[in-house]
């Protein structure tokens, strides 16, 4: 479907008292298309917005975008507040109006103050927090020092060595699995990798925990699927394709492979083939080089020979684009959208094709039924682990540290660190 009909909540007002309407949404999309911001890509395929009424609009796309509704997660601008302004340079950006629980009442070079928004639409929601101060710092060192002496109540960081900077006392912390996903792409145009038993044996032979422990000192999470970061469609995980050396050997033996002279090999058409593969990694990424060496060691201990190809950034990009690799270590920030075209769509990284997967991918694009989506994604996960076109390795870790005196339900998630902030106090 190339169009979306959007219904807005009625009786919502901006913090300055003006009504929030469809015109504000269209104005925002137009500004995003005219500007270069982190949200511009969200609307790059929008060809136009038709206003149906004050609370209904139709968004038209130049092509079908699976799960386009997940692109509609950008802040909305008030047309009345911003119209006629140079959006990139206006002073109004320092204190924009909003429709949320809190509003900006003061903005300076070193801090921003937010206070309870009396115009917020949900009058039934109790908000105990009266005021939030956002402190701004010119360096991360200043930020950490300010947290240590108690000037800040909460910080969020992907720094793996946070304790070295803020110590271990006076605060609590919670860890969140991030969306930076590292995985192996197995090029199925390769003779060996075209065989499911080889791909399975490789997966069974890699101990992901060994990688996160030895390379990252346990500061990364092992992962088993691209959406395995807390996405609602990937909640149930099993270990069916986890580390299991006995299964690695058995799946090869069952398919006619034999282990001789430290190689897994097989004779077909009077020719003996010994399993040997190239592993592509970006030479400039020292951590990934260590991961590659770890994987090489694990696989060669099981008779699967690995040659590490250390490529320059340019060479790596070229190899990925042309699919000129056997196995590639890849990383990407997985979108909040459950769209898996990168992994299963046309021209995917593994040259993988599966008719059932194609059918599921087409079905999930055209339904909003949560039960159907859960059922279909459960099946996608099963196929991912059975066919092994990719091997998920690990995700980054995000840490939220907060003052021990801070009270309330502090439950940050991968999408929003300040979930439930309206009920915090100290």
PLM feature spans:
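A structural "hinge/loop" feature
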Residues: 1, 18, 68-77, 185, ...
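Aromatic- and charge-enriched surface segment that lines or borders ligand/interaction sites
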Residues: 1-36, 58
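Surface-exposed binding/hinge segments that line
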Residues: 5-7, 41-82
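A bilobed periplasmic-binding-protein/Venus flytrap-type ligand-binding module shared by bacterial periplasmic
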Residues: 9, 115-121, 176-201, 205, ...
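Gly/Pro-rich hinge or "lid" segments in bacterial periplasmic/extracellular proteins
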Residues: 72-127, 131, 141, 245-250, ...
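Detector for C-terminal structural segments
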Residues: 111, 205-236, 287-296, 320-426
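Ligand-site clamp/hinge motif
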Residues: 119-165, 305-307
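Append "and occasionally in soluble cytosolic enzymes with long acidic Gly/Pro-rich linkers
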Residues: 194-296, 379
């Amino acid at each position: 479907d190339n169009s979306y009909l959007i219904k807005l909540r009625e009786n919502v007002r901006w913090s300055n008292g003006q009504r929030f309407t469809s015109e504000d949404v269209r104005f925002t999309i137009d500004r995003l298309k005219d500007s270069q911001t982190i949200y511009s890509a969200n609307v790059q395929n929008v060809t136009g917005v038709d206003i149906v009424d004050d609370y209904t609009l139709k968004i038209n796309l130049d092509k079908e975008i699976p799960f386009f509704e997940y692109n509609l997660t950008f802040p909305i601008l008030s047309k009345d507040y911003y119209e006629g302004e140079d959006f990139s340079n206006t002073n109004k950006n320092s204190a924009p109006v909003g429709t949320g629980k809190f509003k900006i009442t003061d903005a300076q070079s070193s801090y921003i103050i937010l206070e309870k928004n009396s115009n917020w639409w949900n009058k039934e929601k109790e908000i105990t927090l009266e005021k939030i101060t956002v402190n701004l710092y010119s360096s991360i060192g200043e930020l950490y020092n300010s947290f240590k002496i108690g000037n800040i109540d909460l910080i969020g960081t992907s720094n793996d060595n946070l304790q070295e900077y803020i110590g271990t006392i006076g605060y609590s912390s919670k860890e969140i699995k991030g969306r930076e996903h590292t995985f192996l792409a197995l090029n199925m145009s390769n003779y060996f990798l075209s065989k499911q038993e080889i791909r399975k044996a490789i997966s069974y032979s890699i101990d992901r925990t060994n990688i996160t422990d030895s390379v990252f000192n346990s500061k990364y999470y092992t992962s088993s699927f691209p959406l395995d970061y807390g996405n609602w469609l990937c909640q149930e995980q099993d270990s069916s394709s986890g580390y299991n050396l006995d299964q690695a050997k058995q799946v090869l033996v069952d398919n006619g492979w034999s282990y001789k002279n430290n190689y897994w090999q097989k004779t077909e058409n009077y020719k003996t083939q010994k399993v040997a593969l190239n592993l592509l990694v970006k030479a400039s990424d020292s951590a990934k080089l260590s991961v590659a060496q770890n994987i090489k060691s694990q696989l060669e201990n099981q008779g699967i020979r690995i040659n590490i190809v250390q490529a320059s950034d340019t060479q790596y990009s070229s190899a990925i684009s042309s699919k000129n690799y056997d196995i590639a270590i890849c990383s990407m920030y997985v979108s909040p959208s459950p769209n898996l075209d990168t992994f299963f769509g046309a021209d995917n990284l593994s040259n993988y094709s599966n008719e059932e997967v194609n059918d599921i991918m087409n079905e999930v694009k055209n339904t909003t039924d949560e039960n159907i989506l859960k059922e279909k994604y459960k099946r996608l996960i099963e196929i991912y682990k059975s066919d092994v076109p990719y091997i998920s390795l690990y995700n980054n870790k995000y840490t939220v540290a907060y003052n021990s005196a801070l009270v309330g339900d502090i439950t940050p998630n991968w999408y929003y660190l300040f979930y439930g902030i309206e009920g915090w106090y100290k």
